[in-house]
Regions:
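Interaction interfaces in information-processing and related assembly proteins
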Residues: 1-197
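Cys/His-clustered metal-coordination modules, chiefly Zn-binding fingers
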Residues: 162-263
Length: 263
């Protein structure tokens, strides 16, 4: 199965795309890939969210053959991308959700400095009943906040869990010395926390020459000729992994005169 997150904006960062591929077999690592499209001359290096303008935050879940893909979209907010993600869950899924994220340079005595990121996603399960205040949503820029979905004991439980989460420190999330299971126990042991086995994740890309050819199969040879370089080739670059593909234009398109193996 596949989970895709995408941000499109009118700011200096035009697009952020991330794909997570679940393990194909038990015991195998999951795969993740990502890229960003941006205008370097317009980048604000001091305040990250100044690079994100008006736009949307989208989630796509594809559970595989025979299952209908699901897509949800919500507007961006100016505070943070994590607030936009929380807003998506509140607006589209009616699930109170909060994210705490940190990133930074981490260094140990044995290794050179490296960039690390870490985070906690807190979500109230199962869905609470509708409990939107009569005076409207209270989240950033008119979006629902997690508290807008809760009342009574559910709101009290949510507030208590957030109180625990507020004690997390940056080094606990990005430092290599504290295992995630130990951190979760420290934060939520009073709530009877249960920690599942960790899922290994590595970089992985699904691009291939066959996929490039498939994407070009909707074009005629006339269209393909407009994509041909001065050297007489059709080229394509994968934005995720940087792989380059160099193809004979007579072997691509729905009316290609030659077979690919003729190259």
């Amino acid at each position: 199965w596949k989970l895709s997150l995408q941000v499109q904006s009118k700011g200096a960062v035009r697009m952020i795309a991330t794909d997570y591929f679940g393990p194909s077999k038990e015991g195998e690592p999951a795969q993740i890939r990502a890229y960003a499209s941006y205008d370097e001359e317009r980048l604000d290096h001091d305040v990250a969210m100044n690079n994100i303008g008006d736009g949307y935050f989208a989630v796509l879940i594809d559970q595989g053959d025979g299952m209908k893909p699901y897509q949800g979209i919500t507007g961006l907010v100016s505070t943070s991308l994590s607030d936009a993600a929380s807003g998506y869950f509140a607006q589209s899924e009616q699930l109170p959700t909060r994210f705490v994220l940190y990133h930074g340079l981490s260094q140990t005595d044995e290794a050179a400095p490296s960039w690390r990121g870490g985070g906690v996603m807190l979500q109230q399960m199962p869905p609470a009943g509708e409990h939107v205040p009569s005076d409207g949503p209270t989240g950033p820029e008119g979006h629902l906040a997690p508290e807008d979905l809760l009342g009574g004991d559910a709101l009290e439980n949510w507030s208590r869990a957030n109180f625990h989460l507020d004690t997390v420190e940056e080094l606990e999330l990005i430092g290599p010395s504290l295992p995630p299971q130990d951190l979760l126990y420290r934060l939520f042991h009073e709530e009877g926390v249960r920690v599942f086995d960790a899922q290994a994740v590595r970089f992985g890309c699904t691009c291939s020459e066959d996929r490039v050819r498939q994407s070009l199969s909707i074009y005629s040879q006339k269209d393909i000729s407009k994509m041909t370089t001065d050297e007489g080739r059709v080229t394509a670059d994968c934005q995720f992994c940087g792989a380059s593909y160099d193809l004979d234009p007579t072997t691509v398109g729905f009316d290609a005169p030659n077979e690919p193996n003729a190259e």
